[in-house]
From Swiss-Prot:
It is a multi-pass membrane protein. Its main location: membrane. This is Na(+)/H(+) antiporter NhaA 1. The chain crosses the membrane at residues 19-39, 56-76, 98-118, 128-148, 157-177, 180-200, 208-228, 264-284, 297-317, 335-355, 364-384.
């Protein structure tokens, strides 16, 4: 992928520009939220912090409302981005999908294999194999934004496209590997609601209200069905009509995406980060850091991501299946591959799904994610800053 598609219309270009800007700024806010959570969790306020998260409201803990409710809005945003990019954006043609597609596949496979190798023989911890397989688009773009305008737009678009495809892979993994104890009547109700949403799309209903009301109903049914509730957000997004290029001024999808971006970037994701990054470091020793879970997560993110993304990209380019992003070189591409190891939001999210009955393992996941993502952010920014300072 070398540039934004020529098929993309002016409003689509504006949406992409705002997307990159808000995701970058949102990533910085997310960093602050994560740091604040770490400080609070290791201060005199820690008891209040964890007490609030575990307090129950309307049958669910505050933590579950955030992870199952607010994150459904995040996944709605992810679904809207995927649909826009595939229909009229940077993933509109197979040629544009090739490089981020191969890179995303490699960047999911290698980290998972590293985690599996380190946790082999332990069925309980092996279920966390998907934790290091995701890239946090907000965090990664936020770190990349620290270099300012020195970074070619093509590299930013490549990273955004890769992370979007990465999210699509993560959604698929959650659907197939982290859903259990299915409630068939509720699942049938969810499919019936989804069928109505699809019918609205086919009938070219362009008012958002019916979609949003049915989407809320879909979320409830999916929550009760045993399938993870956040998938309702993705399903709803795929049903909201994009419209033809000449109708983009009235596109429900673009309108909703524009309205949601800042709320997701500056509220939903930081709240999730603050609620999930807090881990008490008391009692954690160097010996704990080499336990299979934190070691597998940290090495999967920091080592596995850069190897998987860069190797897959090199093979695709050398085979003539893709081209190097415009105005970039191999070292810069490698720097971006390192940044793909920032897996904060989705990695923490999958960690909660992988170990629902063990706070100890969830805390180990948090430590591994913080170390792996931190190393990836530092190494990536140092390499890219050194490289760009020479030009």
């Amino acid at each position: 992928m070398t540039q934004v598609s020529n098929r993309e219309t002016p409003r689509g270009v504006a949406v992409l520009s705002r997307f990159l800007a808000s995701e970058s700024a949102g990533g910085i806010v997310l960093m602050a939220a994560a740091l604040a959570a770490l400080i609070v969790a290791n201060s005199s306020l820690s008891a209040s912090y964890f007490s609030i998260l575990h307090s129950v409201w309307l049958g669910l803990s505050v933590e579950l409302w955030i992870n199952d409710g607010l994150m459904a809005i995040f996944f709605l945003m992810v679904g809207l981005e995927i649909k826009r990019e595939v229909l009229a954006g940077g993933l509109a043609t197979w040629g544009q999908r090739a490089l981020p597609g191969f890179a995303a596949a490699g960047g999911m496979l290698v980290p998972a294999l590293i985690y599996i190798a380190i946790n082999w023989g332990n069925p309980q911890t092996l279920s966390g194999w998907a934790i290091p397989a995701a890239t946090d688009i907000a965090f990664a773009l936020g770190v990349l934004s620290l270099l300012g305008n020195r970074v070619p737009t093509s590299l930013k678009v490549f990273l955004a496209a890769l992370a979007i495809l990465d999210d699509l892979g993560a959604v698929t993994i959650i659907a197939f590997f982290y859903s259990s104890g299915l409630n068939l009547p509720m699942l049938a109700a969810a499919f019936a609601t989804l069928a109505v949403l699809i019918a609205l799309n086919r009938l070219n209903v362009r008012r958002l209200l019916p979609y949003l009301l049915l989407g809320a109903l879909l979320w409830f049914f999916v929550l009760q069905s045993g399938v993870h509730a956040t998938l309702a957000g993705v399903a709803l997004a795929l049903c909201i009509p994009m419209g033809k290029p000449e109708e983009e001024a009235r596109s429900p999808l673009l309108f909703l995406e524009e309205k949601m971006h800042y709320w997701v970037a500056f509220a939903v994701v930081p709240i999730f980060g603050f609620a999930n990054a807090g881990v008490s470091l008391s009692g954690i020793t160097l010996a704990n850091l080499i336990d299979p879970v934190p070691m597998g997560v940290a090495l999967g993110l920091f080592v596995g991501k850069q190897i998987g993304v860069f190797l897959a990209a090199v093979l695709a380019i050398r085979a003539g299946l893709a081209t190097l992003p415009e105005n970039s070189n191999w070292v810069q591409l490698y720097g971006v591959a390192i940044l793909c190891g920032i897996g904060f939001t989705m990695s923490l999210f999958i960690g909660n799904l992988a170990f629902p009955g063990s706070q100890h393992l969830i805390d180990e996941v948090k430590v591994g994610v913080l170390i792996g993502s931190g190393l990836a952010a530092i190494a990536g920014i140092l390499l890219l800053r050194t490289r760009f300072s020479r030009h």
